[in-house]
Curated annotation (Swiss-Prot):
Residues 147-223 form the RRM domain. Expressed during muscle development in adaxial cells, somites, cardiac precursors, finbuds and jaw muscle cells. Pfam families: Fox-1_C, RRM_1. Residues 49-65 have a biased composition (Pro residues). The keyword Transmembrane does not apply. RNA-binding protein that regulates alternative splicing events by binding to 5'-GCAUG-3' elements. Regulates alternative splicing of tissue-specific exons. GO terms for molecular function: mRNA binding; RNA binding. Changing F190A: Loss of RNA binding. PANTHER family: ATAXIN 2-BINDING PROTEIN 1-RELATED, RNA BINDING PROTEIN FOX-1 HOMOLOG 1-LIKE. This is RNA binding protein fox-1 homolog 1-like. Its main location: nucleus. GO terms for cellular component: cytoplasm; nucleus.
């Protein structure tokens, strides 16, 4: 007999406190009624381990504890309490079906849905009803919506009353319009019906008919897409040269126009049209005219463009007297020592850098080539 209670763990992990046989002779595990293990001759000693439970082999479902749990069926409640041992188990029962009462109760939630036994007939009836409703809406919209027809290739003598009389037999016409220009009718027009159905009927009847030897065409009028044309920018003949900054560098001849709106720099105004030529670059004119900037003078100009380049003027051809050249100021003419073009290198004075070349009227191509081959070059470094 044990002197103190001993805690024994079963395979399920629940502690079991063994008691002596004198206290609970019929409840203690491992009593004399059970199988005695080896060395279990004393009936007062408890059975230490219970027999291991049996597990199903792999791949099979575990057996249902039919002997311990009641069947879970949706049957009526058990008023007699057959399962007294399982008083904590709640048995759920399904709803009671009593014929027409359940149908009436279910229809209270959806009272608008038709009650039919055939779902196919239900879908057909609903579809036919919606189709009828859609057709009525479409028909009503067609009657209320006006429609415009485009009539082309009509006789040129036709006027609005003639076109109204031709289409008025098919329905009420809201508007008739024939397009005209300064020479008369353009041969087409528009007819607006109050109803789209009447417009379609008129289009089917009159399209392709012969009226006074002309086959008219009647079609549905479509909205014209109106596109706004871009505004043409204000440019002159020179295009991009209208900018005063760009024109001063690349097109100084624009500043010789008397009506040009932009202000003209003082050196350019003083030596406009003078003999100080420099391939049309404003930088040369500014440098060469710096000495006479203090005494500017007005420059008479022709009504047209006074050319800055000698290649553009009449002096490019050579042999013309000075009276036929571009008008220039007195101050500019006094200091003019360079040629108007490439044909005459020196016109009024000698070159201070080369004393062997004297004043001359013009040089030919051969003479110019010989001068350059002979060492004449103002920009030579030595």
């Amino acid at each position: 007999m044990l002197s103190s209670p001993t805690v024994i763990l079963q395979p399920y992990g629940l502690p079991v406190y063994p008691q002596t046989a004198s206290c609970y002779p019929g409840i203690v595990q491992g009593a004399a009624a059970q199988e005695a293990g080896p060395g279990n001759g004393d009936p007062s000693l408890p059975q230490v381990y219970a027999p291991p439970p049996s597990y199903p082999p792999p791949g099979q479902a575990p057996p249902t504890p039919a002997a311990r749990l009641p069947p879970l069926d949706f049957s009526a409640a058990h008023p007699n309490s057959e399962y007294a041992d399982h008083h904590q188990l709640r048995v759920y029962q399904g709803p009671q079906h009593d014929g027409t009462e359940s149908i009436t109760a279910s229809n209270t939630d959806d009272s608008l849905a038709p009650v039919t036994s055939d779902p196919q007939s239900l879908s057909v009836s609903v579809a036919s009803g919606s189709g009828a409703a859609g057709g009525s809406d479409e028909e009503g919209g067609g009657k209320a919506q006006p429609k415009r027809l485009h009539v082309s290739n009509i006789p040129f003598r036709f006027r609005d009353p003639d076109l109204r009389q031709m289409f008025g037999q098919f329905g009420k016409i809201l508007d008739v319009e024939i397009i005209f220009n300064e020479r008369g009718s353009k041969g087409f027009g528009f007819v607006t019906f109050e109803s789209a159905v009447e417009a379609d009927r008129a289009r089917e009847k009159l399209n392709g008919t012969i009226v006074e030897g002309r086959k008219i065409e009647v079609n549905n009028a479509t909205a014209r897409v109106v596109t706004k044309k871009p505004q043409t920018p204000l440019v002159n003949a020179a295009g991009w040269k209208i900018n005063p900054v760009m024109g001063a560098m690349y097109a100084p001849e624009l500043y010789t126009v008397a009506s040009f709106p932009y202000p003209v720099p003082t050196p350019t105004l003083a030596y406009r049209g003078s003999g100080l030529r420099g391939r049309g670059r404003a930088v040369y004119n500014t440098i060469r005219s710096a000495a006479a900037a203090a005494t500017p003078a007005a420059v008479p100009a022709y009504p047209g463009v006074v050319y800055q380049e000698g290649l553009y003027g009449a002096e490019v051809y050579g042999g013309y007297p000075a009276t036929y050249r571009v008008a220039q100021s007195a101050s500019a003419a006094a200091t003019a020592t360079y040629s108007d073009g490439y044909g005459r290198v020196y016109a009024t004075a000698t070159d201070p850098y080369h004393h062997s070349v004297g004043p001359t009227t013009t040089y030919g191509v051969g003479t110019m080539a010989s001068l350059y081959r002979g060492g004449y070059n103002r920009f030579t470094p030595y």
